[in-house]
């Protein structure tokens, strides 16, 4: 009899068996485990397994039903379990397909749970936060899952990651993206789930929080800190590699996992239409309306600041001469003053006067933890001032700060890709594959995507001519001269330009500013 342990180690198998039963399969769980084991990773392998399973069934005198439920039939039986969306023409919103046809996705807040039908199906239902030890060989040791003893997000019990169960995808993100918990003809496992030898991982890990470089020099994923800026792409990569040589910063493989899950769940290419993200928080020259001496606090008009916001104080604009990148911790009413409040913040005490100005920069990490649903933003999903969470990942793909992607770059307008995390660099084309078949357009609103068939997870803008409310609904910047690094998603001042498909390919490797950051990429 087949080993049914797959049902305790592979969440996708649980879903596949339940769905197959719902569609008429009458075999046992052990028989179905054999079918999945024989199914293989592509149609050719499935066909071979099918013949073997049918022959075995005949020899054993099993019922015609069991014989029909061969490897290929098993894949067909779960065919209705893909979740997809189809886009046609210029509207950013699409039509849900497959088992998601009647699904609803309404993000929640800190007071409303919204409605999200994807919470009940894999792979979304299997995503969970965990505290993890990052091993030098690239593997991950889970110390505690959220809700278990020992789970804490300050880094004292390891990095905070999101575990994602193995799933499969098909279609281009801008045309007909589909997600399935089980292998199906025409589907592939995302690059993030493939080992260097081609075998599959049963799970992968994403950072739960935007990247922050700690006192140890390493790039972290923890709550309650200011995500790092003002570093070059090489400096961020060096900080990630302190964990081990195969660690890096965000890649197209990380993007692929999140993008397929997000676009299918949202049902639109205009991700900001569902959750705006931190794209309109930025403000300078906020007046200091009262003086304070030697306090870790500042007095401002009511409504200007909230706990979790990152601020600096100086003489105006982005000056930080008084206080640098502090996190607002509390807002207190001032007795007898209905117009102003006292905002306390982290760090040492300072002296502020009414000659000073506050720079409201972005949100600190962990500021979406108050959301009571799997996806949503505290207070508002539409005001552009609050962090959002998507199945445990905070501010993924867009908003707050640009994110570097390190596995591809432009050289004189042509994309080059590297599949070896130990060889990312921006000084030459060595160890990179030239994607000469991808012709990139000039600057403009992105309309659609293209990919090299060898690297289908890397999908880049093909045409421009859209708008902020049509097609991909994100902007595309490019400089076709010299070597250009990849920035994705936009920052807290980019407004409607921001989004998962918002790319900036204009900067060289020496670029750095507070708006640029990087997330940790975990190989194991």
Which residues fall in each region the model found?
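Compact beta-rich and alpha/beta scaffold cores in large eukaryotic transport/transcription complexes
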Residues: 334-346, 406-437
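N-terminal module-boundary/linker segments of secreted carbohydrate-active enzymes
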Residues: 76-186
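Short, low-complexity N-terminal tether/leader segments at secretion or assembly junctions of large
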Residues: 1-77
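Short aromatic-cysteine micro-motif
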Residues: 155-158, 187-320, 330-397
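Short, Lys/Arg- and Gly-enriched loop/turn segments at beta-strand edges
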Residues: 317-329, 410-416
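Acidic glycine-/aspartate-rich tracts in secreted/extracellular proteins
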Residues: 25, 167-169, 211-213, 317-318, ...
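C-terminal, surface-exposed recognition/capping segments
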Residues: 81-90, 260, 401-409, 430-524
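Short catalytic/ligand-binding loop motif for oxyanion handling, primarily in non-cytosolic enzymes
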Residues: 171-172, 214, 256-259, 411-414
């Amino acid at each position: 009899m087949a080993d049914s342990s797959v049902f305790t180690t592979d969440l996708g198998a649980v879903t596949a068996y339940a769905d197959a039963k719902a569609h008429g399969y009458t075999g046992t769980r052990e028989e179905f485990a054999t079918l999945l084991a024989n199914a293989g990773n592509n149609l050719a392998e499935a066909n071979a397994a099918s013949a073997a399973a049918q022959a075995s069934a005949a020899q054993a005198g099993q019922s015609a039903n069991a014989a029909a439920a061969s490897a290929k039939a098993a894949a067909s039986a779960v065919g209705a379990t893909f979740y997809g969306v189809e886009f046609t023409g210029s509207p950013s919103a699409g039509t849900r397909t497959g088992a998601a046809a009647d699904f609803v996705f309404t993000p929640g807040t800190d007071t409303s749970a919204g409605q999200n039908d994807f919470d009940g199906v894999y792979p979304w239902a299997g995503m969970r936060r965990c505290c993890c030890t990052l091993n030098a060989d690239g593997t991950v040791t889970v110390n505690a899952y959220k809700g278990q003893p020992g789970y804490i997000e300050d880094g004292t019990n390891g990095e905070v990651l999101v575990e994602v169960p193995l799933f499969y995808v098909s279609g281009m993100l801008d045309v007909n993206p589909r997600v399935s918990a089980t292998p199906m003809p025409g589907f592939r496992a995302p690059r993030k789930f493939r080992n260097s030898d081609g075998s599959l991982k049963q799970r992968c890990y994403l950072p739960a929080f935007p990247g922050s470089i700690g006192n140890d020099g390493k790039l972290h994923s923890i709550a309650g800190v200011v995500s790092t800026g003002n570093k070059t792409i090489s400096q961020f990569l060096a900080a990630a590699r302190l964990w081990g040589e195969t660690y890096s910063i965000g890649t197209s493989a990380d993007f692929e996992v999140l993008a397929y899950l997000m676009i299918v769940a949202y049902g639109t290419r205009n991700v900001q239409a569902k959750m705006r993200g931190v794209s309109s928080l930025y403000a300078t020259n906020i007046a200091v309306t009262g003086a304070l001496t030697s306090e870790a606090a500042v007095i401002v008009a009511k409504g200007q600041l909230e706990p979790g916001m990152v601020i600096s104080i100086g003489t105006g604009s982005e000056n930080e001469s008084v206080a640098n990148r502090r996190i607002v911790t509390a807002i207190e009413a001032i007795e007898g003053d209905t117009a102003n409040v006292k905002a306390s913040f982290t760090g040492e005490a300072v002296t502020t006067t009414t000659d000073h100005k506050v720079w409201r920069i972005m949100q600190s990490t962990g500021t979406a933890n108050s959301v009571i649903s799997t996806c949503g933003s505290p207070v508002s999903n539409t005001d552009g001032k609050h962090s959002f969470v998507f199945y445990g990942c905070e501010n993924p793909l867009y908003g707050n700060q640009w994110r570097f992607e390190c596995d591809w770059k432009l050289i004189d307008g042509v994309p080059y890709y590297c599949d070896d995390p130990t060889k990312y660099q921006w000084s030459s084309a060595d160890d990179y594959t030239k994607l000469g078949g991808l012709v990139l357009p000039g600057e403009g609103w992105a309309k659609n995507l293209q990919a090299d068939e060898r690297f289908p997870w890397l999908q880049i803008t093909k045409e421009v001519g859209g708008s902020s409310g049509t097609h991909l609904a994100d902007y595309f910047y490019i400089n076709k001269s010299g070597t250009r690094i990849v920035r994705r998603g936009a920052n807290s001042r980019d407004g409607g330009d921001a989004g998962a498909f918002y790319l900036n390919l204009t900067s060289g490797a020496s670029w750095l500013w507070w708006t640029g950051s990087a997330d940790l990429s975990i190989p194991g």
